[in-house]
């Protein structure tokens, strides 16, 4: 299993991307990594960690990097040798099995589209983010690839999300919900209203109707379907809420009496367990579903821990043949069966 890493992507590259790759290789004997980017910088980090001669770690030179503030389309046209582009080409040319792309989400999506192409029947790929809930994990998609979706895009997302949830959650018939401002089928904007009856009439997904934002942390369904604008707002709010609540608890304890501090010590193990369960860094990243290859988008602020996890998830998705499952699903039903352009 060989994974291509955009070693120059993200706020802490290349240090954290390289360290995370080292950790993944050390922990998984079947994984090899190809670090794409500035050879000298990458080699220096490998050498400092006694991994410069590891046969399962190689370096592939890329002379350019796409920054977080650059326009994705323009950057890809100007920077043909950008690390994310080169990493994607390694999968396209069958030299690697998957890509890990921290950094600019827009650039990553564009690189995947141009480099790998779309699966037949998919108009737009979606980012499928695992969301921690009280009952486990819920897959939310789209969480940032497309800000203006049509009903057909949401339908395609529901199909891909259902297949992903089967692999991720191990559920034979995962439940699917459409994110809306109310549970009634008559509520919502034009896109959601048009999407509802299509999902309701499909036999290959277990559609449970509309859900509201408050239902997500409850784990009401296994798959939450929404457009990328709404999904990204929900995702960022959830990340900020966990951080804010954690700080609020700490501040309250420090400002409390000696009895409050003693009580905090007693519940500390439970609080740490809860914090770990809600920590988005535990998930590593999110797959971009709908392109012809396993493509993991990692958080721009990813540290070594998240990179390692993203690599392991990517390896698992390749082994479980997620791309093949999506192709088969799109051939059976879904966007190929319905004649709609709205």
What are these regions (language model features)?
Residues 13-17, 42, 80-94, 98-112, ...:
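Short glycine/serine/threonine-rich phosphate/pyrophosphate-binding segments
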Residues 50-96:
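Phosphate/nucleotide-donor binding subsite
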Residues 1-43:
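N-terminal phosphate-binding or glycine-rich loops at protein starts, especially the Walker A/P-loop
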Residues 113-126, 132-140, 220-224, 228-340:
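Glycine-rich phosphate/nucleotide-binding loop
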Residues 6, 35-37, 60, 101-103, ...:
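Short beta-strand segments
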Residues 15-16, 28-34, 40, 147-209, ...:
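Glycine-rich phosphate/diphosphate-binding loop of Rossmann-like nucleotide-binding domains
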Residues 4-15, 145-155, 297-304:
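Short, glycine-rich nucleotide/cofactor-binding loops
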């Amino acid at each position: 299993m060989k994974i291509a890493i955009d070693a120059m992507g993200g706020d802490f590259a290349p240090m954290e991307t390289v360290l995370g790759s080292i950790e993944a290789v050390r922990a998984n004997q079947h994984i090899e990594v190809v670090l794409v980017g500035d050879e000298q910088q990458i080699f220096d980090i490998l050498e400092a960690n006694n991994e410069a001669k590891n046969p399962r770690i190689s370096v592939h030179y890329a002379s350019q990097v796409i920054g977080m503030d650059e326009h994705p389309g323009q950057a890809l046209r100007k920077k043909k040798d950008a690390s994310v582009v080169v990493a994607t080409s390694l999968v396209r040319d069958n030299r690697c099995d998957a890509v890990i792309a921290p950094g600019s989400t827009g650039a990553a999506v564009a690189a995947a589209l141009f480099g790998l192409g779309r699966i037949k029947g998919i108009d737009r790929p979606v980012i499928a983010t695992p969301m921690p809930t009280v009952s486990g994990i819920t897959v939310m998609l789209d969480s940032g690839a497309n800000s203006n979706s049509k009903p057909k895009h949401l339908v395609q997302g529901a199909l891909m999300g259902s297949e992903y949830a089967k692999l991720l959650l191990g559920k034979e018939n995962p439940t699917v919900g459409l994110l809306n401002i109310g549970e009634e089928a008559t509520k919502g904007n034009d896109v959601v209203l048009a999407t509802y009856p299509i999902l309701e009439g499909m036999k290959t997904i277990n559609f449970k109707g509309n859900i509201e934002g408050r239902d997500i942390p409850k784990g009401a369904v296994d798959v939450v379907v929404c457009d990328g604008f709404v999904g990204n707002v929900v995702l960022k709010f959830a990340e900020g809420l966990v951080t804010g609540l954690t700080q609020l608890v700490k501040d309250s304890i420090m400002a409390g009496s000696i009895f409050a501090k003693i009580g905090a010590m007693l519940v500390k193990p439970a609080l740490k367990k809860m914090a770990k369960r809600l920590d988005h860094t535990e998930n590593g990243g999110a797959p971009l579903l709908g392109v012809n290859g396993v493509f993991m988008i990692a958080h721009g602020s990813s540290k070594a821990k998240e990179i390692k996890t993203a690599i392991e998830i990517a390896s698992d998705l390749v082994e479980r043949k997620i791309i093949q499952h999506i192709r088969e699903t799109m051939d059976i039903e879904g966007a190929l069966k319905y004649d709609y352009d709205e």
